[in-house]
């Protein structure tokens, strides 16, 4: 068995005295993730006077989050397996005296077996119960639950479908197009839209094999594919004392390959009546699954204003920042407080949506080349600032973008008093943002912020497909960007 090689633990001089109200707060949390989300969790812990322990692979040894945590430990083997080895992570938590583990998103965040392993070791898993993770992790069972409590669902097959004959029968009844979904899928993976019997036959086996490889479960199911919907999700917070609230919605319609690129809060198209109905539906589902901690209930909203439940993500979302910006509620802090057994100190009527927020995902990708992931070394880095601008990231000059992980480098979130102000602020922030050495989504995002349909709120999940002109942006650096890059190179050369 691999021995743990420790990155010399460094304890800060700050106090780790827990808050005085309620039962005792955690003294040390192991952050079972990396990059920007690890930094986000570490910051929340510091505000709660909780010590942190990070884990990292050799590929991440120079990561900012490794240096900012109070302690850090290398895990392996390889750059990814260590983050997925639940036994090793729980053993490490026990060895170093951590009393809780925060999984972030991705990796083990939706792994019920890992949550159970934490419980068995006396370690608090900062997230929902294993039972809730299991139920919401199976998209077929989640649909059945939603239907049983009266929440609308997209017409689909009743259970996992593997045999093509049953799939063809459903498609004939529902009408094309239909979408093939992995029963255990998520994050935009395991989805295939088909528009004919021939395409359905061709894709059933392929989708099943992909699902087996990605999720360890080859079962798939079919739904009627809704053309040009909005992808709307509601942020849930639920404590262990029966209180469940929602923090409003996010519009995540601007996507590539069913994966989100830009998130907006609140939605520009929801009426107060529809927001109330969808929020109540989200809470109904959370209550039915006996949910606690932070979670997201996702819906499709069709062009006629009908909404349909599609899934619940039992974890923290990448895009939680836009909700925090318009509600002034710290979601990660509340995750920790809830996991410690404390009641929420927020009532539904306390939640108000102030202004508008936009998040752009700054990915190391080439949008002109089908969003191909890019690697390399960051040769110049200057992040934007100013009122209403927030950066969540773990990138810096000389940072090497590894090929092993998600392409996300940073999240740029802005808030404005109005939609127009938020867009203007995002445009200005993207113009200020300098990140050289690897291709990123920054110039692509600049183009979107100037698109008239985007400015007018005329977008849905087909936005990128129906706006090919967005991909014709100029990749040449602006003169001021070159000045920054040259200055950074001179400073590095002279040892400044």
Description of each model-found segment:
Residues 5-8:
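Short hydrophobic alpha-helical segments enriched in small aliphatic residues
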């Amino acid at each position: 068995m691999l021995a743990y090689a420790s990155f010399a633990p460094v304890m800060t001089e700050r106090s780790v005295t827990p808050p005085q109200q309620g039962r005792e707060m955690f003294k040390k949390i192991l952050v079972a993730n990396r990059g920007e989300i690890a930094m986000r969790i570490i910051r929340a812990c510091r505000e709660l006077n909780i010590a942190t322990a990070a884990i990292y692979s050799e590929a991440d040894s120079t990561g900012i989050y490794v240096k900012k945590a109070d302690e850090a430990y290398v895990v392996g083997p390889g750059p990814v397996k260590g983050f997925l080895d639940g036994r090793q992570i729980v053993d490490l938590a026990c060895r170093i005296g951590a009393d809780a583990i925060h999984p972030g998103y991705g990796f083990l965040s939706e792994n019920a077996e890992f949550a159970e392993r934490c419980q068995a070791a006396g370690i608090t898993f900062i997230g929902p119960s294993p039972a809730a993770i299991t139920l919401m992790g199976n998209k077929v069972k989640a649909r059945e639950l939603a239907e049983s409590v009266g929440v609308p669902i997209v017409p689909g097959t009743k259970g996992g479908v593997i045999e093509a004959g049953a799939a063809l029968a459903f498609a004939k009844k529902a009408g094309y197009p239909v979408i093939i979904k992995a029963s255990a899928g998520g994050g935009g993976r395991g989805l295939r839209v088909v528009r004919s019997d021939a395409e359905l036959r061709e894709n059933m086996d392929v989708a099943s094999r992909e699902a087996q490889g990605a999720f360890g479960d080859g079962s798939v199911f079919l739904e009627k594919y809704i053309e040009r919907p909005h992808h709307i999700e509601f942020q849930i917070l639920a404590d262990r004392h029966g209180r469940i609230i929602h923090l409003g919605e996010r519009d995540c319609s601007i996507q590539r390959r069913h994966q989100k690129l830009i998130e907006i809060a609140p939605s520009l198209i929801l009426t107060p009546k529809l927001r109330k109905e969808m929020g109540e539906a989200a809470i109904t589902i959370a209550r039915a699954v006996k949910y606690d901690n932070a979670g997201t209930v996702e819906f499709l909203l069709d062009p006629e204003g009908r909404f349909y439940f599609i899934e619940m993500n039992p974890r923290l979302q990448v895009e939680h920042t836009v909700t925090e910006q318009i509600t002034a509620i710290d979601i990660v802090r509340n995750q920790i407080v809830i996991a410690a057994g404390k009641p929420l100190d927020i009532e539904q009527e306390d939640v108000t949506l102030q202004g508008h927020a936009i998040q752009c995902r700054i990915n190391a990708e080439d949008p002109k080349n089908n969003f191909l992931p890019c690697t390399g070394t960051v040769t110049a880095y200057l992040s934007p600032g100013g009122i209403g601008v927030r950066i969540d990231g773990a990138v810096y000059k000389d940072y090497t973008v590894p090929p092993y992980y998600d392409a996300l480098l940073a999240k740029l979130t802005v808030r404005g008093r109005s939609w127009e102000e938020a867009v203007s602020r995002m445009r200005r922030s993207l113009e200020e943002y300098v990140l050289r050495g690897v291709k990123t989504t920054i110039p692509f995002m600049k183009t979107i912020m100037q698109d008239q349909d985007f400015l007018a709120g005329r977008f849905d999940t087909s936005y990128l497909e129906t706006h090919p002109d967005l991909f014709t942006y100029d990749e040449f650096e602006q003169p001021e960007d070159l000045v920054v890059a040259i200055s950074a190179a001179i400073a590095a050369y002279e040892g400044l």
